[in-house]
From Swiss-Prot:
Domain of life: Archaea
Protein name (record): Glutamine synthetase
UniProt keyword Metal-binding, yes or no: yes
Enzyme class, broadest EC rank: ligase
Membrane-spanning residues: none
Organism of derivation: Pyrococcus abyssi (strain GE5 / Orsay)
GO biological process terms on file: glutamine biosynthetic process
Known catalytic reactions: L-glutamate + NH4(+) + ATP = L-glutamine + ADP + phosphate + H(+)
Subunit text: Oligomer of 12 subunits arranged in the form of two hexagons.
Binding site for L-glutamate: G229, R283, E289, R301, R320
Record GO terms (molecular function): ATP binding; glutamine synthetase activity; metal ion binding
Job description of the protein: Probably involved in nitrogen metabolism via ammonium assimilation. Catalyzes the ATP-dependent biosynthesis of glutamine from glutamate and ammonia.
Species classification: Archaea, Methanobacteriati, Methanobacteriota, Thermococci, Thermococcales
Family from the record: Belongs to the glutamine synthetase family.
Keyword flag Transferase: no
Length: 439
């Protein structure tokens, strides 16, 4: 594909292009090139030093190449610059630790089976005033679905939604969330790789618009103790030959039920990837509609997996534990491979619940076979190390991921010890704010 084809739908002629990829944490990284080098970036790639990118290479062997994916070209409406995602190469071959490449390989496995995965995310975020400290100021007092005077950020949300189509995102619903200054803008589902790209773009738009209004936007899972956390529920369906194969005659198909079985089977290990930060586990506590118990049910928001009340081609499942700190490429790859394992081995879903699982006593949960998700990043990493299917979903990136996250956990424990804080504290620490606030 040449540059003229890439820009066929463009309305302006930016002088620079941002080459965007993500590190092991899902944080966007990149570089700018003159627009005149875009064709080179597509065909030959642009070299860069991978040693300073978290979770990539050491300084002794750090040369990497970024090749632009021309299908992702967009122009930033408020700046004289375009953006493009791409893939990382090393020594002429796809780089194993490239998160986007990890998801691409999983999608190719699905394609061999004639399957496409569609995912719709619900990323939540807070808007805070800037005050030069970690004493976070809340700019509004609205609550869930509040409108008009109580939602002080309604104009900001509208502005975000107006910019989204320029990046290929279709906004669907804008609303205030449960927490004061907490918000959600849902955008239309798409194929898994496009949705992962869209999540990165969405965060970029939200933060840029907030900045203009003198605010900080954070997707940190639990920025304030005692307030609801930020989740990122994922709506998932699989399609084959234009048909939703999660669709059954009455409700879900056997394929969908086995996919649920796979997610339940691998849920503990998956959590290390869908909830990959110390702070993630301060959201996953009872009382805030964040799932804690490994269970599933129809229309039941207390379960880990909810089946929404949509049938026919709208049939899907909602995986409720992920949060916006997840690297979406890793998270989607792991979830899809866990679900496929369930389909392959015909894993029947277990721990079905119709009532509020939080209100059950321990005996009832035990009777229904309901287990709990890991209670900390350390516990989640232990589960990941034991789960071959989820490990292999990350491919060569697994080694980098587990090493990086083990160091992160150890650093947090050292901080707690130095501050004489209990290991199981659910308070949000300054260590977390410094590390995760700008996720």
């Amino acid at each position: 594909m040449n540059v003229s084809e890439v820009k066929s739908g463009a309305t302006r002629s930016p002088k620079f292009v941002q080459l965007i990829f993500v590190d092991i944490n899902g944080m966007p990284k990149g570089m700018e090139i003159p627009a005149s080098r875009l064709q080179e970036a597509i065909e030959d790639g642009i070299s860069f030093d991978g040693s300073s990118v978290p979770g990539f290479q050491g300084i002794e062997d750090s040369d990497l190449i970024f090749k632009a994916d021309p299908d992702t070209y967009v122009e930033v409406p408020w700046d004289n610059v375009a953006r493009v995602y791409g893939y990382i190469y090393k020594d002429g071959k796809p780089y194993g630790a490239d998160p986007r490449g990890v998801l691409k390989r999983v999608i190719e496995k699905l394609a061999e089976m004639g399957i496409k995965a569609y995912i719709g995310p619900e990323p939540e975020f807070y808007l805070f005033k800037k005050n030069g400290s970690w004493e976070l100021e809340i700019p509004d007092v609205g609550g869930y679905f509040d409108i008009l005077t109580l939602d002080k950020a309604k104009d900001i949300k509208r502005e975000i939604a107006e910019y989204m189509p320029s990046f290929g995102l279709v906004p669907e619903v804008l609303h205030h969330e449960v927490g004061k200054a907490q918000h959600e803008i849902d955008f239309r589902y798409d194929e898994a790789l496009k949705t992962a790209d869209n999540i990165i773009s969405f965060k970029y738009i939200v933060k840029a618009v907030a900045e203009v209004h003198g605010l900080y936007a954070t997707f940190m899972p639990k920025p304030i103790y005692g307030m609801p956390g930020n989740g990122m529920h994922l709506h998932i369906s699989l399609w084959k030959e234009g048909e939703n194969i999660f669709k059954g005659e009455e409700g879900l198909s056997e394929t969908a039920l086995h996919f649920i079985g796979g997610l339940l089977k691998h849920a503990k290990a998956l959590t290390a990837i869908t909830n990959p930060t110390v702070n993630s586990y301060k959201r996953l506590v009872p009382g805030y509609e964040a799932p804690v118990y490994i269970s599933w049910g129809y229309k039941n928001r207390s379960a880990l997996i909810r089946v929404p009340a949509f049938w026919g081609n709208g049939a899907r499942i909602e995986y409720r534990c992920p949060d916006p700190s997840a690297n979406p490429y890793f998270a989607f790859a792991a979830i899809l491979m866990a679900g496929l394992d369930g389909i392959k081995h015909k894993v029947e879903p277990f721990a079905y619940v119709e009532e509020n699982v939080y209100e059950m006593d321990e005996g009832k949960r035990k009777e229904l076979g309901i287990d709990t998700l890991p209670g900390s990043l350390g516990e989640a990493l232990d589960e990941l190390e034991k789960d071959k299917v989820v490990r292999e979903a990350l491919g060569e990136a697994y080694k980098n991921f587990i090493e990086y996250k083990r160091k992160e956990w150890e650093s947090y424990l050292e901080y707690l010890e130095a501050k004489h804080l209990p290991k199981d504290t659910k308070r949000v620490t300054e260590w977390e704010l410094e590390r995760y606030f700008f996720i």
